[in-house]
From Swiss-Prot:
The gene is Pik3ap1. PANTHER family: BANK1/PIK3AP1 FAMILY MEMBER, PHOSPHOINOSITIDE 3-KINASE ADAPTER PROTEIN 1. Residues 10-145 are annotated as: Necessary and sufficient to mediate inhibition of NF-kappa-B downstream of activated TLRs. Signaling adapter that contributes to B-cell development by linking B-cell receptor (BCR) signaling to the phosphoinositide 3-kinase (PI3K)-Akt signaling pathway. Has a complementary role to the BCR coreceptor CD19, coupling BCR and PI3K activation by providing a docking site for the PI3K subunit PIK3R1. Alternatively, links Toll-like receptor (TLR) signaling to PI3K activation, a process preventing excessive inflammatory cytokine production. Also involved in the activation of PI3K in natural killer cells. May be involved in the survival of mature B-cells via activation of REL. The lineage of its organism: Eukaryota, Metazoa, Chordata, Craniata, Vertebrata. The keyword Ribosomal protein does not apply. It comes from the Eukaryota. Residues 8-146 form the TIR domain. It is found in: Cytoplasm; Cell membrane. Residues 530-550, 801-811 have a biased composition (Pro residues). This is Phosphoinositide 3-kinase adapter protein 1. GO terms for molecular function: identical protein binding; phosphatidylinositol 3-kinase regulatory subunit binding. Residues 182-318 form the DBB domain. Disruption phenotype: Mice lacking Pik3ap1 display altered B-cell maturation and impaired immune function. Pik3ap1 depletion has an opposite effect in NK cells by promoting their maturation. Mice lacking Pik3ap1 and Cd19 have severe defects in generation of immature and mature B-cells. Moreover, mice lacking Pik3ap1 display increased IL-10, Il-12 and TNF pro-inflammatory cytokine secretion upon activation of the Toll-like receptors TLR4, TLR7 and TLR9.
Length: 811
């Protein structure tokens, strides 16, 4: 056993075992960095195994005003030592001054009530709590140990508790709950001002009352106060320099309450008046004739204005992932509001903030500090917008989670490359924007790009023309273009581009045909010539015909699977051997064939798939499905105006990413080919019409053509065939219309189509909490003591084997 800094009358005593050494050091640093607790004297008591607990050790506990017990596996193992537990029971009395911190120990692991009868009266904390929770629990324990609510309470304590609560020369204690009001709370420099302080507890006239003014850069000054009545104290404010000053009220040696007052000069007051008169929010409300002043109305107006002025093709091509991670101090600016994101965070413009986060440079602006060293998230919390602070933090964390998830899915075990980084950035930007704003035009284009590339060319040209010359909103695009894209997808037409089909019919080029210029005249004789015959393939070599191929079709596919390069559906093994590997350019946007969203789907894609299933089942026709999608899109745009709706979408996206990470071990490695209903070969069965289990139409059991098998040729069939073979995932839920943005139930079932096998349960992922909003945010949390399995009540220390700690967590 060892007690560091031993002395009588300590305020905080940290009781721990060697396996919680890092948590003890962390709490000491936390108490020193907090202005409200740093004045309290802190000691530590380290309990080592096989050590005795002497009377001197007992006095260390008795003189402490707060006993903070770090309950770890090693400490619980010491409870079985002979003669130690009774001494600890006496040391942890009275219970209101004891706080326990569970370090890898669960309340249900042991019957702690049998160890300590007052266990239920202890304050409890966990390793996942925020630093404010630790500070509040310690302050509460010290406050309750100070005596009682009123400083005039002089009733004698119970004689049984006297030996355990002996205190002399109590240091100041902060009790902010006793304060009601301070008038005035702003004091003019150089002017005599009387400050009135109203408290909740009764003050004793026989005890001297004083007020202590503590400036930040000068010594403290104590001024004698006057009791106006039992609850009111008046003091003459001393002449101090401008700035915030801490004010404490003492009744004898006991701190009754503490607050902060500010001193100001005449010039500072003039500046405050001018800044309040030129309030930008009130000015804009007046300019837009918003009477009475309403921040929510102004927020919607500015958000809609920004949406209408963004180019129709969107700004996501520029990216938003410019988060500065190195040399953060160089990003501090001299302005109070260096970016529009800081402005929106200060005045609580929530919808505008959500829209700005999807614009280029959003994360770069997030990493810029103003002249006071505050970032947009801390500015929002400072001005009372805690929900906005939480939204900004979760958005940035979700971007990082999503980018990491997509990059891992794209790499699929390959070495890291700049190409995957660029593809992950672009996919993350698009998916974040489409998830927070379901039904937007960017989502419509991206949804169609993967399924009907030929139909998206017209819309893409219109988007480029609108952004280059005459900027127009997405609603101004030609209605037939949008409708044709949606209709083609819902009908399940072939997704092969037209140029690919033309190459199949014209494999020999155009030089064999007469090229006619439409602008020039041509002779009638040339027009009346018979058409040129279709070129035939090369004649086979003379000799006997090749023997019939009796190898099953599916066997060929699996035989060629081992020869193909993993992850490339459209390049054969021959071309890989003959041609060198070509890596795409870093800034080249990924093609849709690579599934840039890594199996995840936007809300619009899921709604279109649901409607496509309904069309295939005959529930609705194509025209009705188009109308349903337009109605859903309009509804989503209206709901996107709500900040709460965007919060829910962000939460669903985070949960979806977490589920996919947990389900990844279940599916294992993704297979390269999607296996549909195999074709049976039989010499006795005639050719007949069959129906697959999940197919909506008949198919013929015929032998396939003898062509070179490629993975892409088998997998990338028409949307009607591929969707029919996989419609079992969504046919059940297709009867219901998806009415919200990121539906959690739908996302649960969106397992990649190629993943059909069932694997083991998901692996537990330990989430790291984020320390935010405290003056000690720079402190790194120590490693959590891992949880131990439930065991019987320990009798000897040999029965305890604490596991090693996990790596440190933190931002």
């Amino acid at each position: 056993m060892a007690a560091s800094g031993w002395g009588r009358g300590c305020d905080i005593l940290i009781f721990y075992s060697p396996d919680a050494e890092e948590w003890c050091q962390y709490l000491q640093d936390l108490f020193v960095s907090c202005r409200q607790v740093r004045s309290q004297k802190t000691q530590t008591y380290r309990l080592v195994p096989d050590a005795s607990f002497s009377a001197q050790d007992l006095w260390v506990f008795r003189d402490a005003r707060c006993v903070l017990v770090l309950l770890s596996a090693g400490l619980v193992g010491c409870f079985g030592q002979p003669g130690l537990l009774p001494m600890l029971q006496r040391a942890c009395h009275p219970p209101q001054r004891v706080v326990r911190l569970l370090c890898g120990v669960q309340p249900g692991d042991e019957d702690f009530q049998a160890f300590f009868p007052d266990w239920a009266h202890w304050q409890e904390m966990t390793c996942d709590d925020e630093p404010e929770t630790y500070l509040a629990a310690v302050r509460k324990a010290i406050s309750e140990d100070s005596g009682c609510d009123s400083v005039t309470d002089t009733e004698p304590e119970d004689e049984r508790e006297l030996p355990f609560s002996k205190q002399t020369n109590l240091p100041p204690e902060i009790s902010p709950g006793n304060l009601m009001v301070v008038q005035p709370d702003r004091i003019r420099c150089g002017a005599e001002t009387t400050v009135y302080i109203i408290v909740r507890c009764k003050l004793d006239e026989k005890v001297s009352t004083e007020a202590e003014f503590s400036p930040e850069d000068s010594p403290s000054i104590r001024v004698e106060g006057t009791l106006e009545n039992e609850y009111t104290v008046s003091v003459k404010a001393p002449d101090l320099s401008s700035g915030n000053v801490s004010l404490k009220v003492y009744s004898g040696d006991l701190v009754v309450c503490e607050t902060t007052v500010s001193y100001y000069t005449d010039m500072e007051e003039i500046g405050n008046l001018l800044s309040s008169a030129a309030n930008p929010v009130e000015f804009m409300c007046q300019a837009f004739k918003i009477v009475p002043y309403n921040t929510e109305t102004l927020d919607k107006l500015l958000t809609e204005s920004l949406k209408n002025n963004i180019p129709a093709s969107g700004l996501h091509l520029f990216g938003i992932n410019q988060l500065e991670e190195d040399d953060m101090m160089t990003n501090q600016r001299d302005e109070e509001l260096p970016t529009l994101l800081h402005f929106a965070a200060k005045y609580g413009l929530k919808n505008l903030t959500a829209l700005l986060l999807t614009c280029p440079g959003a994360l770069q602006a997030y990493s810029v500090a103003n002249k006071h060293g505050h970032y947009p998230n801390t500015i929002a919390e400072k001005h009372g917008f805690r929900d906005l602070r939480q939204f900004i933090d979760e958005y940035v964390e979700t971007v990082d989670m999503l980018k990491t998830h997509i990059k891992e899915e794209l790499m699929q075990g390959e070495e890291a490359d700049d190409v995957y980084e660029s593809m992950a950035h672009l996919s993350t930007d698009l998916l974040m924007k489409c998830s927070l704003n379901p039904g937007c035009d960017d989502e419509l284009y991206e949804s169609m790009a993967a399924f009907a590339p030929a139909a998206t060319e017209d819309l893409y040209v219109e988007m480029l023309q609108a952004s280059a010359g005459n900027p127009v909103s997405g609603e101004s695009f030609s209605r037939p273009t949008k409708d044709s894209m949606i209709r083609k997808f819902l009908e399940g037409n072939s997704v092969k581009p037209a140029s690919w089909e033309r190459e199949q019919h014209h494999p020999y080029g155009e030089e064999l045909y007469h090229i006619v210029d439409e602008d020039e005249t041509f002779s009638v004789d040339l027009a009346n010539r018979p058409p040129v015959p279709v070129p035939r393939p090369e004649a086979s070599a003379p000799g006997p015909p090749p023997p019939p191929d009796n190898e099953p079709y599916i066997s060929k596919v699996f035989a060629e699977k081992s020869q193909e390069r993993l992850g490339n559906f459209y390049v054969s093994s021959e071309s890989i051997r003959k041609e060198p590997l070509v890596r795409p350019w870093r800034d080249r946007p990924p093609s849709s064939i690579y599934d840039p969203f890594a199996g995840m789907k936007t809300p619009g894609q899921r709604q279109l798939i649901t409607l496509q299933e309904q069309v295939k089942l005959g529930i609705v026709n194509v025209d009705e499905a188009v109308l349903h999608f337009k109605e859903w899109q309009l509804n989503q745009k209206k709901r996107s105006e709500s900040f709460r709706f965007q919060q829910e979408n962000l939460k669903r996206l985070r949960e979806s990413i977490t589920r996919r990470r947990k389900e990844k071990p279940k599916s294992g490695k993704h297979t390269d080919l999607e296996i549909t209903v195999p074709i049976r070969h039989s010499q006795h069965l005639p050719e007949k019409v069959e129906f697959g289990v999940y197919e909506s139409g008949p198919r013929k059991s015929v032998l396939p053509a003898r062509t070179e098998l490629r993975r892409g040729d088998w997998k990338t069939d028409s949307m009607s065939s591929t969707a029919s073979s996989t419609s079992n995932r969504s046919s059940t839920r297709s009867l219901l219309s998806v009415s919200s943005g990121m539906e959690g139930d739908n996302e649960d079932n969106e397992i990649p189509e190629i993943t059909r096998s069932r694997g083991p349960g998901p692996t537990q992922v330990d989430g790291a909490p984020v320390v935010t909003g405290t003056p000690v945010g720079t402190l790194e949390r120590p490693p959590r003591v891992p949880p131990r399995a439930a065991s019987q009540r320990p009798l000897t220390r040999e029965s305890f084997h604490p596991p090693p700690p996990v790596p440190p967590r933190g931002r």
